[in-house]
């Protein structure tokens, strides 16, 4: 499950950073944390895989100008059905029915109704005078009393800068005051409120519990312990599972990477990478690559770079150190994260999966390959990058997330020469990958064929669960895997980067393969299954992809389609089109992979009109049986 943080028009950069940093220790052990914009909220089926939506501090008017009726409806429905919403300062104003924000200069006043209306009343502010936009001139260490967090009320101080007070909370039976300002009249004292909305939970704040005392001239480090307890309490009110001990949680530091094997192809890759180092540097290159022989303590080579853009904070150029050389030493270094010796035996003969870079902690396997162009130019088909933990993972669209340990995250290269464009059905590769994931799971070993993994068009893998998933055609499903395919055309070669993430051993509440294995093993009548390993699963998936890729190029997609249909969820499904009307899914074209949908009339009877839907232009919302346009 995801925790989404809005990162679009209106969101303050510093508030985004503080929100990310403060929530990370509580969230990432159990959830994936993603940044999303208004387009994502409108067009992606995010509610089905989301536990919490966070609207950070910033400008409420920016949110209003970017959100449309579809977004408001999706957020409201998400909460009413059991989701959670956290509104911090501007996000608190935004979640109220009425905003009454008044400044000494009346031209700066913001007064009016809002559409989410989780709090049925008015959020009035600034609670304290002196606020100035884009400044800390009016910021203060607000004294508050928190009720319900412990057996008796707790006094602490929290960062304040322009936030509001929630008025007349006593008039609403579904509203509970969590914290009150101590330095205001009682009627303006509600600083944090909890609201029950349908089956869901909402917390709105006028203060900034996400701001730590670290580096702050306003806050006192003596309040940090209570601030963290307050954050934990807020997340529990929102229905999230929170680790008891967060001291060992949070985002680990980026690590060195390990290149395997030490063979002729790997050496050619390094030589080519060094040859591609030119004076006229590519503007979009993100990293400095530093290749070091593991037998030597001194780096031997460096590739030039420009600055990093993947970080949330301003930073200098980032160095990515890649060790190569002696296989025994490389395997020993990588083994805590990935057993390269075992993997090499399992992947033998496959065109994909070697050479491989193993990174215990990486920003993104996809970004490393497709946003570093000289590095990309040096790779051959099959070159693979695996990360145990991604701090800025990428999915379909332009959004990033922090993926927790237990996710098998990898990306690999397919190079297509310009002369072969007309005979290479590139659009079908994402279908092959989805099928390879399903078959890689089901053919992991004898007995695993009963793992209920299925394909959701166009590029996701879902598993059937007993409870807690999306109700689809009378059964419950949860997302297990997502796939992304990106491309770069350079020097008469189209470089395709196929990225995939599979939940293998994630901690709850999300589903993972090993939780399915645990459930299977609880039944004594079932033959006992061993838990999935990263090494064996990656080899199984890539071997399957290799088989389908060969078959596609040699025989065509029509021979693969029957097997694809065996595992996809959409045969003869009646769907709603976002453009209006309904249709019945007929299948997929064997040339370009278009989804075929036969339109229905107002009586839900088939017409003669069939529409072709592109996989890269549309998204499937299982929860609502809805196909929407995607950008």
Curated annotation (Swiss-Prot):
Enzyme Commission identifier(s): 6.3.4.-, 6.3.4.9, 6.3.4.10, 6.3.4.11
Subcellular location: Cytoplasm
Enzyme class name: ligase
One GO term describing the cellular component: cytoplasm
Catalytic activity: apo-[methylmalonyl-CoA:pyruvate carboxytransferase] + biotin + ATP = holo-[methylmalonyl-CoA:pyruvate carboxytransferase] + AMP + diphosphate + H(+); apo-[propionyl-CoA:carbon-dioxide ligase (ADP-forming)] + biotin + ATP = holo-[propionyl-CoA:carbon-dioxide ligase (ADP-forming)] + AMP + diphosphate + H(+); apo-[3-methylcrotonoyl-CoA:carbon-dioxide ligase (ADP-forming)] + biotin + ATP = holo-[3-methylcrotonoyl-CoA:carbon-dioxide ligase (ADP-forming)] + AMP + diphosphate + H(+); biotin + L-lysyl-[protein] + ATP = N(6)-biotinyl-L-lysyl-[protein] + AMP + diphosphate + H(+)
Pfam family, any one: BPL_N
Keyword annotations: ATP-binding, Cytoplasm, Ligase, Multifunctional enzyme, Nucleotide-binding
Protein family per UniProt: Belongs to the biotin--protein ligase family.
Binding partners and assembly: Monomer.
Chain's role: Post-translational modification of specific protein by attachment of biotin. Acts on various carboxylases such as acetyl-CoA-carboxylase, pyruvate carboxylase, propionyl CoA carboxylase, and 3-methylcrotonyl CoA carboxylase.
The protein, known as: Biotin--protein ligase
Organism: Schizosaccharomyces pombe (strain 972 / ATCC 24843)
Record gene name: bpl1
């Amino acid at each position: 499950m995801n925790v989404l943080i809005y990162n679009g028009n209106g969101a303050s950069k510093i508030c985004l950073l503080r929100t990310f940093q403060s929530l990370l220790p509580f969230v990432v052990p159990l959830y994936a944390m993603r940044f999303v914009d208004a387009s994502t909220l409108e067009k992606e089926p995010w509610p089905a895989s989301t536990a919490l939506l966070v609207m950070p501090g910033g400008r409420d008017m920016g949110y209003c100008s970017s959100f449309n009726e579809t977004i408001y409806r999706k957020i409201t429905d998400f909460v009413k059905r059991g989701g959670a919403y956290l509104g911090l300062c501007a996000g608190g104003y935004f979640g109220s029915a009425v905003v009454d924000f008044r400044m000494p200069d009346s031209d700066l006043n913001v007064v009016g109704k809002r559409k989410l209306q989780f709090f049925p009343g008015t959020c009035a502010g600034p609670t304290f005078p002196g606020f100035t936009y884009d400044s800390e001139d009016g910021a203060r260490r607000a004294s508050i009393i928190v009720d319900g967090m412990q057996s008796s009320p707790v006094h602490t101080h929290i960062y304040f800068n322009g936030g509001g007070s929630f008025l007349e909370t006593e008039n609403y039976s579904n509203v509970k005051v969590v914290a009150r300002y101590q330095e205001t009249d009682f009627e303006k004292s509600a600083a944090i409120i909890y609201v029950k909305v349908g089956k869901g939970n909402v917390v709105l704040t006028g203060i900034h519990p996400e701001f730590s005392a670290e580096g702050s001239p306003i806050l006192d480090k003596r309040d940090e312990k209570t601030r963290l307890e307050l954050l934990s309490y807020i997340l529990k009110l929102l229905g999230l599972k929170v680790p008891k001990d967060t001291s060992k949680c949070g985002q680990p530091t980026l690590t060195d990477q390990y290149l395997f094997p030490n063979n002729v192809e790997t050496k050619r890759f390094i030589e080519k990478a060094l040859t591609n180092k030119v004076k006229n540097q590519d503007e979009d290159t993100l990293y400095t690559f530093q290749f070091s022989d593991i037998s030597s303590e001194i780096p031997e080579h460096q590739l030039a770079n420009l600055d990093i853009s993947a970080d949330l904070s301003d930073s200098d150029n980032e160095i990515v150190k890649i060790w190569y050389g002696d296989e025994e030493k490389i395997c020993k270094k990588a083994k805590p994260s990935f057993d390269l010796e075992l993997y090499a035996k399992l992947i033998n003969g496959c065109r994909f999966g070697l050479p491989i870079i193993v990174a215990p902690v990486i920003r993104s396997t996809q970004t490393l390959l497709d946003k570093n162009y000289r590095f990309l130019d040096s790779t051959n088909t099959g070159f693979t990058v695996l990360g145990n933990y991604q701090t800025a993972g990428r999915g379909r669209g332009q959004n990033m997330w922090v993926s927790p340990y237990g996710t098998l995250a990898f990306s690999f290269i397919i190079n297509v020469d310009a002369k072969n464009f007309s005979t290479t059905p590139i659009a079908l590769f994402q279908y092959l990958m989805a099928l390879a994931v399903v078959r890689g799971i089901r053919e992991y070993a004898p007995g695993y064929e009963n793992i209920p993994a299925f394909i959701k068009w166009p590029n996701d893998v879902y598993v059937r669960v007993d409870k807690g998933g999306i109700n689809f055609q009378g059964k419950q499903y949860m997302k297990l895997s997502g796939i992304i395919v990106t491309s770069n055309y350079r020097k008469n070669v189209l470089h395709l980067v196929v990225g995939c993430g599979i939940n293998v051993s994630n901690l709850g509440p999300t589903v993972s393969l090993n939780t399915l294995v645990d459930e299977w093993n609880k039944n004594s009548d079932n033959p006992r299954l061993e838990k999935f390993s990263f090494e064996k699963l990656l080899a199984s998936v890539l071997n399957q992809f290799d088989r389908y890729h060969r078959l596609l190029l040699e025989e065509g997609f029509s021979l693969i389609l029957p097997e694809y249909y065996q595992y996809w969820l959409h045969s003869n499904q009646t769907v709603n089109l976002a453009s209006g009307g309904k249709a019945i899914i007929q299948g997929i074209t064997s040339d370009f992979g278009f989804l075929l949908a036969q339109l229905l009339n107002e009586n839900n009877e088939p017409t003669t009109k069939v529409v072709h839907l592109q996989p890269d232009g549309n998204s499937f919302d299982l929860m609502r049986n809805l196909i929407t346009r995607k950008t």
